[in-house]
Amino acid sequence: MPTQRKIETVADLKQRLKRMQVTVVADYRGLSVADMTELRKKLRESGAEFVVAKNTLTLIAARETGHEAIEPLLAGPTALAFAYDDVPKFVKAINEFNRGPKKIIVRGGLVGTMLLNENVLDTVASLPTKEEVRAQVLGGLAAPVTGLAGIIAAPVNDIVNLLDATSKSILYALQARIDQLQPSAS
């Protein structure tokens, strides 16, 4: 008979699996409580969550949500990291943590219901983050607007230059005519 706590854990895992875009499965052996806290903080900053769960409860939740592809990754001490929004930022946070003295061993993960190995996650880390994509898009949108402003301003500038040149040529022509008339009048 399952305990109330196990039922709640399965319900929580099911909710996380339904919301996630990517789940990373890792072995956390060798990490101290301080290391785990640091990792959780880094992941929270990237909009993700890091939980330790029993494999049997994780498997029950996975089967009930259609994520049974995760089963081969559930062996030994297992931690799950769930990314809900900015996946490249999430994977970069894991890679950044793993550059330190303590590391988690990434076994693989899920994108939707598709199983991924750790090499694919490294590729995802090389993708631009949501903020970087926004900056690129805004930069791409601003360039044509700047060009359009130049195109719109060019005819106005040309007209001003033409009028300026025309008024100067009229003045030069009038001055030349006055100069012509003055010597003949004397």
Curated annotation (Swiss-Prot):
GO terms for biological process: translation. InterPro entries: Ribosomal_uL10, Ribosomal_uL10-like_sf, Ribosomal_uL10_bac, Ribosomal_uL10_bac_type, Ribosomal_uL10_CS_bac. Transmembrane segments: none annotated. Signal peptide: none annotated. GO terms for cellular component: large ribosomal subunit. Keywords: Ribonucleoprotein, Ribosomal protein, RNA-binding, rRNA-binding. It holds the Pfam family Ribosomal_L10. GO terms for molecular function: large ribosomal subunit rRNA binding; structural constituent of ribosome. It comes from the Bacteria. The keyword rRNA-binding applies. SUPFAM superfamilies: Ribosomal protein L10-like. NCBIfam families: PRK00099.1-1. Forms part of the ribosomal stalk, playing a central role in the interaction of the ribosome with GTP-bound translation factors. Belongs to the universal ribosomal protein uL10 family. This is Large ribosomal subunit protein uL10. It comes from Roseiflexus sp. (strain RS-1).
